[in-house]
C-alpha cells in the first residue's frame, strides 16, 4: 500500500527525565493516562478527520488510473510503453517529493504542507482534464504524484502530533482507512463513467472540489504544537495544546515535547548506516520489508486491475471496471479488522498470515490463467474490436454526434454496421489485391486501434473467469491485512525516536522507487512472458517475504518501544531471534500432550512465556 511516515512525535510511553516522573505521578494516583493524554475531545477528532481526507485523495488518485487508462489509451492511441509511463509518472513525482518532503514539512509546517498538497492536487487534476496530448498528461500525473507523496508524510505527522497518547494509533490509522476508502471510490467512479463519452475527464475531476474544501478547512485548524516548539513558539504551542486537550494548563505535555526534541539531536542521518545501536541491521530490515511490499505485485493489481481483468474474460470496459470495484470493497473490509486487532494479534502474525495466503491465491490465479486460452502476450495493447472501432469513428469522431443524441446515434450505428458488413469481405481480399479504397480505410482503422484477434468472451468458461476474480480478491484481502498496513507499523517501532523520522523518509523513498520500477515494467514483462508466469513470480516473492518475516521481523506486541530498541540493539540479534524461535517452539509444543485443567494450562503458559522473555532480554545474549 501507500508509504506513510507514522512518526510518533514525542514518545509518551517511556521518556527519560521529566516524562518518567510524570508517568509515575499519574500512575500513583490510580489513573492509566495523565490528564493531558486523556484529552481527546471532538475538536481533536475533527482535526484528525479533516487531515485524514488527504488519505482519501491519495487512495482515489492511486486507483482512478485503472479505469481511466482503458479510455485514454484508445483516445491517444498509446503504446504499451506509453501506458506504463502514464501510470508511473505519478510515482516519479511521488519519489521526488519523498526525497525533499521531510525538509519542506520541517521548515514550513505540517498544516501548510497539507494545504499546499491539496492545492497542487487540484491543479494537477485540472491539467489532466484539459490535457489533449500525451506530454501534458504526464505533466499532470507528475504534479499529482508530488501532491500525494507530500500529503502522505505531512498528514500522519500532523495527526500523530496533535493526538493524545492513548488515541494516537487509532487516529493515525484513520489515514490508512481513508486511503482504502479512496481506492474504493475510484473504482466506483471507474464503473460509473466506463461508458460515458470522455468519462475519464469526470474521473479525474471529481477530487477537485474535495481538495479545495480540505485546503480551506485546514487553514482554520491550529498548527502542530510540536512544530511550534521546534520554531521556539512555546507560548503558541501551549495555547494549541490547551485547545486540543481541553485543559487550562498543558505545561506537563509541553515539557515532554521539549525533552523528546532534545533526544532527537543525538542521531544524525548517517547513523542509519553505522553499527551504533545495530542501526545498520535495522535499516536493512526496514528496506527489505518495503521491498517485499512492492515486489509481491500489489501495486500492479492496484494500477492495472481493469486491464488484468479485461484480459481474463471481462471484455467490456464496464464489466472490467465493475469487477475491479470488488477489489476496492475487499480492501476496505480487510483493512478494518486488521487495524482493530493488530494490538491483540500482533503485526508479525498478520504479516505471516498475509504472505501465506497471498502465495496460495497467486498460485491459483496463475494456474487458472494458464487454462484460459487468450492472447495474454497482448495484454498491454488495445483490445477494441473492429466493430467498436468503426462505431466510435462514426459516432464519436471529431465534429460528429455527441453521446446525448441517442436517436441519431442509433441511426448512425446502423450506418456503421452496414459499412462494416460491406468492408469485412474486402478485408479478406487485401492480401490478394490490396487495391480497394474501402480496404485502405479499413487498414487505417486497424492501425489506429492496434487491432488484434482476441478470443471471444464466450470461449472463456464462466467458472474459470470467476475463479480468477475470486483468487484476485483473496490476494488483495491477504495483502490488506499483512504487507499493506503492517510494515509501516513495524517501521515506526524498530527505530529510536531520535532517528525514526529520517529512517521512515529513507524507507518511504525506497518504497516509491521500487513501486516506480515495478509499475514501469509490468506491461512489458507481461507482454514477454504472459500473465500466468507473472503470477508465479509473485508467488515466489510472497514465499520469500514469509521466510524473511519469520526470521528477521521481531514480534513487538505488548512491548514498549524501549524494549524493542534494546533487543534490536544487540549485535547478534538475528542469531538470537532464530534460536529463540526454535527453543520457544520446542517448549510450547510438548511431545505427549496431557489433559489438564484450564488453570494449570494458564500457569504453564505463563511460566514458559516468562522463560522465553528472560532468554530474549538476558545480558548474556
From Swiss-Prot:
Gene Ontology biological process terms in this record: circulatory system development; D-glucose transmembrane transport
Glycosites: 375, 387, 400, 405
GO molecular function: transmembrane transporter activity
Transmembrane segments: 49-69, 85-105, 120-140, 142-162, 177-197, 202-222, 283-303, 322-342, 350-370, 471-491, 503-523, 533-553
Reaction catalysed by this enzyme: D-glucose(out) = D-glucose(in)
Location, primary (coarse class): membrane
Pfam family, one: Sugar_tr
Membrane topology: Multi-pass membrane protein
Annotated family: Belongs to the major facilitator superfamily. Sugar transporter (TC 2.A.1.1) family. Glucose transporter subfamily.
UniProt protein name: Solute carrier family 2, facilitated glucose transporter member 12
Phylogenetic placement of the source organism: Eukaryota, Metazoa, Chordata, Craniata, Vertebrata
Amino acid at each position: 500500500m501507500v508509504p506513510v511516515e507514522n512518526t510518533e512525535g514525542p514518545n509518551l510511553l517511556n521518556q527519560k527525565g521529566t516524562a518518567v516522573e510524570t508517568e509515575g505521578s499519574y500512575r500513583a494516583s490510580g489513573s492509566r493516562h495523565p490528564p493531558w493524554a486523556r484529552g481527546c475531545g471532538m475538536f481533536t477528532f475533527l482535526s484528525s478527520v479533516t487531515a485524514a481526507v488527504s488519505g482519501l485523495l491519495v487512495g482515489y488518485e492511486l486507483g482512478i488510473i485503472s479505469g481511466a487508462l482503458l479510455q485514454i489509451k484508445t483516445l491517444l492511441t498509446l503504446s504499451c510503453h506509453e501506458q506504463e509511463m502514464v501510470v508511473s509518472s505519478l510515482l516519479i513525482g511521488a519519489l521526488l517529493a519523498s526525497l525533499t518532503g521531510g525538509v519542506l514539512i520541517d521548515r514550513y509546517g505540517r498544516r501548510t504542507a497539507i494545504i499546499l498538497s491539496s492545492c497542487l492536487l487540484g491543479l494537477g487534476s485540472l491539467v489532466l482534464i484539459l490535457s489533449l496530448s500525451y506530454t501534458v498528461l504526464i505533466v499532470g500525473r507528475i504534479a499529482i504524484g508530488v501532491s500525494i507523496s507530500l500529503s502522505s508524510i505531512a498528514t500522519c505527522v500532523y495527526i500523530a502530533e496533535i493526538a493524545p497518547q492513548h488515541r494516537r494509533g487509532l487516529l493515525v490509522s484513520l489515514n490508512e482507512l481513508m486511503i482504502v476508502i479512496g481506492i474504493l471510490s475510484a473504482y466506483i467512479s471507474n464503473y460509473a463513467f466506463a461508458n460515458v463519452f470522455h468519462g475519464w475527464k469526470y474521473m479525474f475531476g471529481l477530487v477537485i472540489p474535495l481538495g479545495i474544501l480540505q485546503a480551506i478547512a485546514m487553514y482554520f485548524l491550529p498548527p502542530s504544537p510540536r512544530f511550534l516548539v521546534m520554531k521556539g513558539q512555546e507560548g503558541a504551542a501551549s495555547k494549541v495544546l490547551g485547545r486540543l486537550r481541553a485543559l487550562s494548563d498543558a505545561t506537563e505535555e509541553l515539557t515532554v515535547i521539549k525533552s523528546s526534541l532534545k533526544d532527537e539531536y543525538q542521531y544524525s542521518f548517517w547513523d542509519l548506516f553505522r553499527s551504533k545501536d545495530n542501526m545498520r541491521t535495522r535499516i536493512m530490515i526496514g528496506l527489505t520489508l518495503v521491498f517485499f511490499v512492492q515486489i509481491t505485485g500489489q501495486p500492479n493489481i492496484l494500477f492495472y486491475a481493469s486491464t488484468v481483468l479485461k484480459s481474463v474474460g471481462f471484455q467490456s470496459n464496464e464489466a472490467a471496471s465493475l469487477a475491479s470495484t470488488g477489489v476496492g470493497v475487499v480492501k476496505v473490509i480487510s483493512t478494518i479488522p486488521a487495524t482493530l486487532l493488530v494490538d491483540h494479534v500482533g503485526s508479525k502474525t498478520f504479516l505471516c498470515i498475509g504472505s501465506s495466503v497471498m502465495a496460495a491465491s497467486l498460485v491459483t490465479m496463475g494456474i487458472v490463467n494458464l487454462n484460459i486460452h487468450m492472447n495474454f502476450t497482448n495484454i498491454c495493447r488495445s483490445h477494441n474490436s473492429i466493430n467498436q472501432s468503426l462505431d466510435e469513428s462514426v459516432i464519436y469522431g471529431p465534429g460528429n454526434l455527441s453521446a446525448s443524441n441517442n436517436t441519431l446515434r442509433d441511426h448512425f450505428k446502423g450506418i456503421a454496421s452496414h459499412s462494416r458488413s460491406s468492408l469485412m469481405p474486402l478485408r479478406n481480399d487485401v492480401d490478394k489485391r490490396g487495391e480497394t479504397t474501402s480496404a485502405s480505410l479499413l487498414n487505417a482503422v486497424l492501425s489506429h486501434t492496434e487491432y488484434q484477434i482476441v478470443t471471444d468472451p464466450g470461449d472463456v468458461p464462466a467458472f474459470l473467469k470467476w475463479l480468477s476474480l475470486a483468487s484476485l480478491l483473496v490476494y488483495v484481502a491477504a495483502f490488506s491485512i499483512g504487507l499493506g498496513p503492517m510494515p509501516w507499523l513495524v517501521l515506526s517501532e524498530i527505530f529510536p525516536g531520535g532517528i525514526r523520522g529520517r529512517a521512515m523518509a529513507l524507507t518511504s523513498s525506497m518504497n516509491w522507487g521500487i513501486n516506480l520500477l515495478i509499475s514501469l515494467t509490468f506491461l512489458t514483462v507481461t507482454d514477454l512472458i504472459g500473465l500466468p508466469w507473472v503470477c508465479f513470480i509473485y508467488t515466489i516473492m510472497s514465499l520469500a517475504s514469509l521466510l524473511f518475516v519469520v526470521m528477521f521481523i521481531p514480534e513487538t506486541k505488548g512491548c514498549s518501544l524501549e524494549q524493542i530498541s534494546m533487543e534490536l540493539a544487540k549485535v547478534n540479534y538475528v542469531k538470537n531471534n532464530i534460536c529463540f524461535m526454535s527453543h520457544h517452539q520446542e517448549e510450547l509444543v510438548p511431545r505427549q500432550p496431557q489433559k489438564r485443567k484450564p488453570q494449570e494450562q494458564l500457569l504453564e503458559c505463563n511460566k514458559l512465556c516468562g522463560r522465553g522473555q528472560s532468554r530474549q532480554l538476558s545480558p548474556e545474549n
